[in-house]
């Protein structure tokens, strides 16, 4: 808000303590002084282009950042992974078929990935069918390999775009960065040799939708472009502007950090890497409108002060401060020398630090050096206090200060990669875990009997095998029975000897050894 009449020391003290000089305009070129009458005093119109005498205004359209534009540009994309599924079958002699599935990878082409993504996005069944395992083939006593190539689409995969060079940043890119997508190079390589990253929209530059068209007025002098009045009514000089491309669009970065799609007729230097642009958000846009209103209000205050001077036919240092030009450019400076009103042409510049205006005690830096005072009076109401300090009775609007601080705090920090290089995958195992291929796991399946023959041949062979097995069983049974009979019909000599017996007188059968014992016992002893 505008500063009202308050004690001078109470105004200066807080600023000195803070160490920050708010936005202020001081002449970098001034003089010579010439006496004027009070009737020659005039208030500067800070909304009229006076810089370098560029007073010719022509309407034109230009591009600037959209209101509400955020620091990062999100680009939706997808990853495409080439997968080869191999089915290996082996049929043994009995007819059992063993099938083993293996998965490998290959590097796909961009055109094939785009087609597969379109299938998935539109719900085309061909995409799901392409992910199925191959139908295994089999032949008796042979190993058969069947392979099938598939493209696995994983979406969304979002990357961050740098508006300065259209580079893309994501952890899946090598070193976290991709130089961009174009018609000649429609994809980005990833940390995995078999995976590509592609934007969902095939048209390059569509994701870089950060501009809006505004209407303003060009300020020229003899055909030379000096600056322009923007859509909010603020004049912006092209002094110190540098060339900067945003999303491939050529433009100028102005001294206040804003960007416009203007090109100066004379050659401008390219911006250095540390010269970033400021965000154009709703708050800054609202502040800029308020700044215009504040400048209009300041002019009304100046007219009121001028009317008071004309009415009272008296002037003071404080009232002279209202006549100062509030924006950079050409204007007038006023002072009192020996009680005489003096006027000088001046070119004002904007300053931010106390040291730019007061580099040392008692030194007011203006016109290229320490400006001399006349009886402790400088100009525009600036005086030298009895203790030797330079005192400035009026400072720029707090809204302008807030505006610049907002711009400075809204720098787009996209010169530095958004991805931490230490998080980039370095091992194959990590890459495999990241891809998470959504296909059937590697598995081993054993089917029923299958000799790889047609239907009737298989049943015929099974029947003949059953008959042969039955005949073999009968033959073996007959042979075993004959051998058993032969063994039973042939007596054992040992058993014959042991089973020989005699008949005693009493008619009882006695084993041969008992008979021998009785006979030997009946003989008389000698």
Curated annotation (Swiss-Prot):
Primary surface antigen capable of inducing and reacting with virus-neutralizing antibodies. Almost all human and veterinary vaccines are based on the functional aspects of the G protein. Glycosylated and palmitoylated by host. Glycosylation is crucial for glycoprotein export at the cell surface. It comes from the Viruses. Glycans are attached at residue 338. GO terms for cellular component: membrane; viral envelope; virion membrane. Its main location: virion. Residues 481-526 are intravirion. Residues 1-19 form the signal peptide. Residues 20-459 are virion surface. A lipid is attached at residue 480 (S-palmitoyl cysteine). Keywords: Glycoprotein, Lipoprotein, Membrane, Palmitate, Signal, Transmembrane, Transmembrane helix, Viral envelope protein, Virion. The chain crosses the membrane at residues 460-480. It is a single-pass type I membrane protein. It is found in: Virion membrane. Belongs to the lyssavirus glycoprotein family. Arg-352 is highly involved in rabies virus pathogenicity. Its mutation dramatically attenuates the virus. Homotrimer. Interacts with matrix protein. Attaches the virus to host cellular receptor, inducing endocytosis of the virion. In the endosome, the acidic pH induces conformational changes in the glycoprotein trimer, which trigger fusion between virus and cell membrane. There is convincing in vitro evidence that the muscular form of the nicotinic acetylcholine receptor (nAChR), the neuronal cell adhesion molecule (NCAM), and the p75 neurotrophin receptor (p75NTR) bind glycoprotein and thereby facilitate rabies virus entry into cells. This is Glycoprotein. The lineage of its organism: Viruses, Riboviria, Orthornavirae, Negarnaviricota, Haploviricotina.
């Amino acid at each position: 808000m505008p500063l009202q009449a308050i004690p001078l020391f109470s105004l200066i003290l807080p600023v000195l303590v803070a160490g920050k000089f708010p936005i202020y305009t001081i002449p970098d070129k001034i003089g010579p002084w010439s006496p004027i009458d009070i009737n020659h005093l005039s208030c500067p119109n800070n909304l009229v282009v006076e810089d370098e005498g560029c007073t010719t205004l022509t309407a034109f359209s230009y591009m600037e950042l959209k209101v509400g534009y955020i620091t990062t540009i999100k680009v939706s994309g997808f990853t495409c992974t080439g997968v080869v599924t191999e089915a290996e079958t082996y049929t043994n002699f009995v007819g059992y078929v063993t099938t083993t599935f293996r998965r490998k990878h290959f590097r796909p082409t961009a055109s094939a990935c785009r087609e597969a993504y379109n299938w998935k996005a539109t719900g085309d069944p061909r995409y799901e069918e392409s992910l199925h395992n191959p139908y295994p083939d089999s032949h008796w006593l042979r190993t058969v390999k069947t392979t099938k190539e598939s493209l696995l689409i994983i979406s969304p995969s979002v990357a961050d775009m740098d508006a300065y060079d259209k580079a893309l940043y994501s952890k899946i890119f090598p070193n976290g960065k991709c130089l961009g997508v174009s018609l000649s190079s429609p994809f980005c390589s990833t940390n995995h040799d078999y995976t590509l990253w592609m934007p969902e929209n095939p048209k390059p530059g569509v994701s870089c939708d950060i501009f809006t068209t505004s209407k303003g007025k060009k300020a020229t002098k003899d055909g030379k472009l000096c600056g322009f009045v923007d859509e909010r009514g603020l004049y912006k000089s092209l002094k110190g502007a540098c060339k900067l491309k945003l999303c491939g669009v050529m433009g100028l970065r102005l001294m206040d950090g804003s960007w416009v799609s203007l090109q100066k007729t004379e050659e401008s230097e390219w911006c250095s890497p540390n010269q970033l642009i400021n965000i154009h958000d709703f708050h800054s846009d609202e502040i800029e409108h308020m700044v215009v209103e504040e400048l209009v209000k300041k002019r009304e205050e100046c007219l009121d002060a001028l009317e008071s001077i004309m009415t009272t036919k008296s002037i003071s240092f404080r009232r002279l401060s209202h006549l100062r030009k509030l924006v950079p450019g050409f204007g007038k400076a006023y002072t009192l020398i020996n009680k005489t009103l003096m006027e000088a042409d001046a070119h004002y510049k904007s300053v931010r630090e106390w040291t730019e205006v007061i580099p040392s005690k008692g030194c007011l830096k203006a016109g290229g050096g320490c400006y001399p005072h006349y009886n402790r009076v400088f100009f525009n109401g600036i005086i030298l206090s009895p203790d030797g300090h330079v005192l400035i009775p009026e400072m720029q609007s707090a809204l302008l200060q807030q505006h610049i601080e907002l711009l400075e705090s809204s720098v787009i920090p996209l010169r530095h990669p958004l991805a931490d290089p230490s998080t980039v995958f370095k091992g194959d195992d990590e890459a495999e875990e990241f891809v998470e291929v959504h296909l059937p796991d590697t598995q081993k399946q054993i089917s029923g009997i299958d000799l790889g023959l047609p239907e009737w041949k298989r049943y015929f062979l099974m029947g003949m095998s059953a008959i042969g097995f039955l005949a073999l069983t009968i033959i073996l049974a007959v042979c075993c029975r004959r051998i058993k009979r032969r063994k039973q019909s042939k007596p054992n000599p040992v058993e014959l000897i042991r089973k020989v017996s005699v008949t005693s007188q009493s008619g009882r059968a006695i084993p041969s050894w008992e008979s021998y014992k009785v006979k030997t016992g009946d003989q008389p002893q000698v």
